[in-house]
C-alpha cells in the first residue's frame, strides 16, 4: 500500500460552475416508468458503504445509517431492480474496530474479506460510496480485491470523494469502471437501465469514465433534484437499523435514543 505522501490531489475543472444553482426538473415518476428493469431479470445491483477509516488515536467516530444509499436503493427497487445494500459499518454486530497493517489507523466495520463474502454472485453492478479522501488508500484496495474476485462486475463509485476527484480515482484505480458525480438518483437509474439493456452510458449526465483511447470523459456534475419530496422512501428494509440502536449509535445527541435520519434539504444552504 502506498503512503499518504504519494497521493497528489488535482483540482477538478467542472465544465459548468453553476451546477449548484441548476435544478433537475424531471419527474421521478416518469423516470421510474421510462427506466424500469427488464422483467424477470435475476441480475443484482449491490450498493456498498465500506468500512470507516480514522486515526488510531480515535477510538471511534460517529457512524450513522447510510441515508444516501437507502434513497438510492429505494429508487432502484421502485424501478424493479433487484437491489442489495452491504453496510460495512453497521450491517453486522458487534460493530468491530481493527487496526490497519501499518498500525496507523483504526478500521471500523467489516473488513475487505468479509465484504467480499457478502457480494451476491448475481451482482451485475456494484456501487460503492466513497465519502472521504483520507479513506481512499484503504477503499482502493477493497475495490481492487472486488474486481479481482468478480472481474465481470461493473463497478461505479459515488460520494463526495468521487465527485471531487473523478479523474484521479479512475486513473489511480482502473478497477473502477465509472463514477457518478453529484446527486445520483436520476443518473444511477438511467445508468442501470442502459447497462441492463446493452445501451451506451457515455452521454448520461453525471457520468465520468476513461474511454477506449485512455482519455478522461466527464459529463459534469448531475443537477440538483428540484423536488426531493417525490423521491421514493428510503429502503430501510435493505439495512439493519436495529444494529445501530443496539450499539448505541444514533442520529440524535442523546445516547441510547432511537432516532432515524430524514432528508429535509440537500447541499449547504449557504452554498
Description of each model-found segment:
Residues 42-44, 82, 258-261:
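Residues that mark the start of a beta-strand
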Residues 56-69:
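Glycine- and acidic-residue-enriched helix-capping/strand-helix junction motifs
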Residues 1-47, 121-122:
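Radical SAM enzyme core and accessory elements
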Residues 40-41, 121-122, 151, 203, ...:
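Residue-level preference for short coil/turn positions at secondary-structure junctions
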Residues 75-76, 82-227:
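Glycine-rich beta-alpha loop elements in corrinoid/cobalamin-binding modules
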Residues 229-230, 234-271:
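Radical SAM [4Fe-4S] cluster-binding motif and immediate context
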Amino acid at each position: 500500500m502506498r503512503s499518504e505522501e504519494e497521493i497528489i490531489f488535482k483540482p477538478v475543472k467542472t465544465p459548468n460552475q453553476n451546477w449548484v444553482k441548476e435544478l433537475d426538473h424531471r419527474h421521478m415518476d416518469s423516470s421510474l416508468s421510462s427506466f424500469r428493469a427488464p422483467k424477470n431479470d435475476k441480475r443484482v445491483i449491490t450498493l456498498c458503504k465500506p468500512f470507516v477509516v480514522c486515526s488510531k488515536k480515535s477510538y471511534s467516530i460517529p457512524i450513522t445509517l447510510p441515508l444516501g444509499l437507502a434513497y438510492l436503493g429505494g429508487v432502484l427497487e421502485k424501478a424493479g431492480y433487484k437491489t442489495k445494500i452491504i453496510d460495512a459499518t453497521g450491517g453486522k454486530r458487534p460493530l468491530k474496530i481493527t487496526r490497519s497493517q501499518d498500525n496507523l489507523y483504526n478500521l471500523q466495520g467489516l473488513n475487505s474479506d468479509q465484504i467480499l463474502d457478502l457480494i451476491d454472485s448475481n451482482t451485475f453492478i456494484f456501487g460503492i460510496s466513497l465519502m472521504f479522501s483520507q479513506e481512499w488508500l484503504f477503499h482502493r484496495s477493497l475495490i481492487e480485491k472486488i474486481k479481482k474476485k468478480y472481474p465481470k462486475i461493473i463497478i461505479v463509485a459515488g460520494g463526495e470523494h468521487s465527485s471531487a476527484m473523478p479523474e484521479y480515482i479512475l486513473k489511480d484505480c482502473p478497477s473502477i469502471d465509472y463514477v457518478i458525480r453529484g446527486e445520483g438518483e436520476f443518473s444511477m437509474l438511467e445508468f442501470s437501465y442502459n447497462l441492463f439493456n446493452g445501451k451506451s452510458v457515455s452521454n448520461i449526465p453525471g457520468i465520468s469514465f476513461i474511454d477506449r483511447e485512455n482519455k478522461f470523459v466527464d459529463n459534469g456534475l448531475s443537477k440538483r433534484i428540484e423536488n426531493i419530496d417525490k423521491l421514493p422512501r428510503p429502503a430501510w428494509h435493505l439495512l439493519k437499523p436495529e444494529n445501530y440502536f443496539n450499539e448505541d449509535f444514533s442520529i440524535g445527541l442523546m445516547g441510547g435514543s432511537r432516532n432515524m435520519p430524514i432528508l429535509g434539504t440537500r447541499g449547504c444552504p449557504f452554498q
